[in-house]
Amino acid sequence: MKRGRLPSSSEDSDDNGSLSTTWSQHSRSQHGRSSTCSRPEDRKPSEVFRTDLITAMKLHDSYQLNPDDYYVLADPWRQEWEKGVQVPVSPGTIPQPVARVVSEEKSLMFIRPKKYIASSGSEPPALGYVDIRTLADSVCRYDLNDMDAAWLEVTNEEFKEMGMPELDEYTMERVLEEFEQRCYDNMNHAIETEEGLGIEYDEDVVCDVCQSPDGEDGNEMVFCDKCNICVHQACYGILKVPEGSWLCRTCALGVQPKCLLCPKKGGAMKPTRSGTKWVHVSCALWIPEVSIGSPEKMEPITKVSHIPSSRWALVCSLCNEKFGASIQCSVKNCRTAFHVTCAFDRGLEMKTILAENDEVKFKSYCPKHSSHRKPEEGLGEGAAQENGAPESSPQSPLEPYGSLEPNREEAHRVSVRKQKLQQLEDEFYTFVNLLDVARALRLPEEVVDFLYQYWKLKRKINFNKPLITPKKDEEDNLAKREQDVLFRRLQLFTHLRQDLERVRNLTYMVTRREKIKRSVCKVQEQIFTQYTKLLEQEKVSGVPSSCSSALENMLFFNSPSVGPNAPKIEDLKWHSAFFRKQMGTSLVHPLKKSHKRDAVQNSSGTEGKTSHKQPGLCGRREGLEVSESLLSLEKTFAEARLLSSAQQKNGVVTPDHGKRRDNRFHCDLVKGDLKDKSFKQSHKPLRSTDTSQRHLDNTRAATSPGVGQSAPGTRKEIVPKCNGSLVKVPITPASPVKSWGGFRIPKKGERQQQGEAHDGACHQHSDCSHLGVSRAPAKERAKSRLRADSENDGYAPDGEMSDSESEASEKKCIHASSTISRRTDIIRRSILAS
C-alpha cells in the first residue's frame, strides 16, 4: 500500500522523512521555520522539493501490469526517493553571470615548487643553488687585458658619437669567446675532411702495421679520424667497423705515449698487460721474443721482459740511437741492427712469408741487402742469402739513388700536407660567420662587426694562434692530471704494500728471536734446577764443603763483573757455552783416569794386602773420589776463566772454532805432563806405613778447610814462553743454541764396560801409579793463576804438579764399587740436565 503524505517543503521532508521522528526534532524544526519566516526580506525560494511526483509514479501492489511495464525498487536507496524532487519555482531569482575586463598584471618570477617538478641529475636539488656545470658554462673563459680595455674605451667614444649604445666588458668577452670557439670547430672539421680525402684517395697509402696498400672484403682499411693512421682490420684487431667515426686506442684514450721498443712517436700502438706502457703493433710482430695475448684483438702486448739484454744493447744503424730493441738483418753473417719503424720509414725490404704449416715468418733486410734483392726474387731465398755479400759490390753505386726515391716522395707528400694546413691557419677568419654570431648572442651586427675586425687584428699579431685554449684540450689536460693522480696513488699503495711486507718480516724475525730466547732461558732454568738438586743430594750424603764451594763456583762462574774491564755480553754468552762443554768433558776425564789407575794397580799389586787388612777403607774413600772429580772439574773451569780474562786484557777475541782448538791443545799438554810425571814417579817405592799416614793427612785436609792447603811457595809452575805475537781475529757471531753440543753421551755398552773395568780394579786392590792433577782449593789456584797471567802477559800456562801433590794423589787409588756407580749416576744427571 502506498503511504499518503501531505505536500511539504524541503525542511518538512527532512523532518518527516523517517518514520522514527521525535518531539524534539519537530520542535527544533518549528523553531527553525519560525526564524526563517521572520526574516526581514520575505523572498520566495528559488527551488522546492516536490514529493507528489514521486507519489504519482508509485503503484499499488495489487495493480495488474505486465512485468515489462514497471520496475521493482529493491535497493536501500528507496527511502531517498521519498524525499522528493528538486524543482525550480522562481527563475527570476537565479543569479546571472557577469564578466569584466581586467588590466594585465606584470609577470612575476616563477618559483619552482619542490613537490610537483622533479629536478634532473645535473641540477642541484636544493633551491637557491646553481649547478657547478651550469655555472662553469656561464662563466666566460676569455679575460680582457690592458690592450682590450684601451680599445673598448676608444670604441665606446665612437659609439657615443654615432649614437649607438655603449659596449660593456662582459659582452666583449662573450663575443671574442664565441669567435674562438666557432673558428676552432670549423677549422678542425675542415682539416679532417681535407686530410681524410687526401689519404682516402691516395694510391700510395699503406697499412701502418703490415705496410700493404691492398684491402680485401672483410679486411678493410680503416682510418683514424684524429691521427689519420691507416690500418687493416686484422692488423689492428678491429672486430667490427663502426658506422660513424673511428678512433685508434691512443686517440680514444687521449694519450700520446712513446713506444717501448723504438723511438718513433705515434702510429698504430697497443698497450701492454699493465696498461701503462705502449708498443707499436709492427714492433711486436717483428721482434721474435714479443708476443700478442689475443690475436683477434691484437692486444695486449706480452713477453716484453723476455727480450734479451743483447737486443736491448743494439744500436740502430739508421737513426744511430741506442733506444728500445732493434732487429737484425736476415741475411746470413750480417749483423746490421735497425728499428722496425726506422726500416719502414726508410723503405727497407720487410717480407712476411706464410709457411706450409700456417706459420708466419718475418724476414727483414738491411739497406745493403735490400737494394739487390729485387732482381733476385726469382732465385729463391737460399741463393739470395748465399750470393748477397759478393754481388752487392757492383750495385753499390746505385744504392743511394734507390734509397732516396721513396724518401723524396714521402717528403713531397708531407710538404704538400703542411702547406694545406698552413693555408687553413692563415685563413682562420673565413671559418667565422658574423650573422650566426649576432643571432646567437642577440647583438646588433654593427657591434659584432667592430669586434670581429679587432679579433682578426689581434690574432694576426699573435701569429694566427688562438687567443684561448680549446675546451677539448683543457679537458684532455684535466683527464691527464687525473690519470697522473691515480698513477701516483697506485705507486703510493705499492710502496705501502712493500713497507707492510717489511714490517711483517721484522715482526716474524723478532718473534723468532724471542722464542729462541725463551728456549734458552728454559734450558738454563733446567740446568740450574738440576744443579740445585745435585747440591742438595751432596749435602744429604755428607760431601765436604770444598765440593759444595766447587759446585757453587760452577754455577756462578759467568756472573757479570762490575768494573771498567768487565766482559761484554757476547763474551759471557761464549763463556757459558764453553763452560758447558768443558763441564761435560771434565766429567768424563776422571772416569778415564780411574781406568788408568786401576790398570796401574793391577800391574803393581804392592798395596793389595793393605787394602784387605783395612775393610772400611773403600767406604771412607768414597767421598774422596767424588771430591777428586769435582776438584778436577773446578780446576778446568778456573783455567778457562783465567784464559778468557787474559784475552780480554790483551784485546784478543777468539772465535768459537779457535777456542775449541785451544781447549783441545791445552788438554793434550796436561795429559802429556801427567804421563811423564807418572813414568818418573812409578819407580819410587811406597811403604804401607807411608801410605796409611798420607791417607790420614789427606782425610784431615778434605774434612777441615784451610788445614790441608799447601803454601803458595811449595807449588811449582813452569810457564812456557810464547815466541809469536798476538793477532786479533775477527769474531763470527754464533747462535748460543749451536754451542750446546759439547757433551758426548756414551752408549750403554761403553757405560757397562767402564763399570766392569772399575769393579775389577777395585777387587784387585792394586797400587796406583798414575798421578792426578793438583787438588788445591779454588781460591789459592785462582790467585796463582792471576799471578801467572800478570807475569806472562795474559797467557794461562799449564802448571806442573809438585812432589807433595803427586804423593797425595797416590793415596786415592783404592775405591769401592759403590763409589763408581754413584759417580756414574752424577755424570748421567749432568748430561741429562745439559
UniProtKB/Swiss-Prot annotation:
Q: What is the consequence of disrupting this locus?
A: Mice are viable and fertile, and show no visible phenotype.
Recorded hits in SUPFAM superfamilies, A to Z, give: FYVE/PHD zinc finger
* Basic and acidic residues composition bias: residue spans: 747-768, 777-790
Q: Where is the composition biased (Low complexity)?
A: 24-35
Q: Where is this region: Interaction with KAT7/HBO1 and histones?
A: 61-81
Its chief place of residence is nucleus
Q: Phosphothreonine-modified residues are where?
A: T93
Keyword terms of this UniProt record = Acetylation, Activator, Apoptosis, Cell projection, Chromosome, Cytoplasm, Cytoskeleton, Isopeptide bond, Metal-binding, Nucleus, Phosphoprotein, Repeat, Transcription, Transcription regulation, Ubl conjugation, Zinc, Zinc-finger
- Please cite one Gene Ontology biological process associated with this protein: regulation of DNA biosynthetic process
Q: Which domain of life is it from?
A: Eukaryota
Q: Name one GO cellular component term.
A: nucleoplasm
C2HC pre-PHD-type zinc fingers: which residues?
256-290
| Localization per record | Nucleus; Chromosome; Cytoplasm; Cytoplasm, Cytoskeleton, Cilium basal body
Question: Residues annotated as region Disordered?
Answer: 1-46, 367-409, 589-621, 676-716, 738-819
Q: Where is the Glycyl lysine isopeptide (Lys-Gly) (interchain with G-Cter in SUMO2) crosslink found in the sequence?
A: K115, K573
Q: Which Gene3D superfamilies match?
A: Zinc/RING finger domain, C3HC4 (zinc finger)
Family note: Belongs to the JADE family.
What is the name listed in the Swiss-Prot or TrEMBL entry for this protein? Protein Jade-1
The scientific name of the source species is Mus musculus
Q: What is the lineage of its organism?
A: Eukaryota, Metazoa, Chordata, Craniata, Vertebrata
Gene name of this polypeptide: Jade1
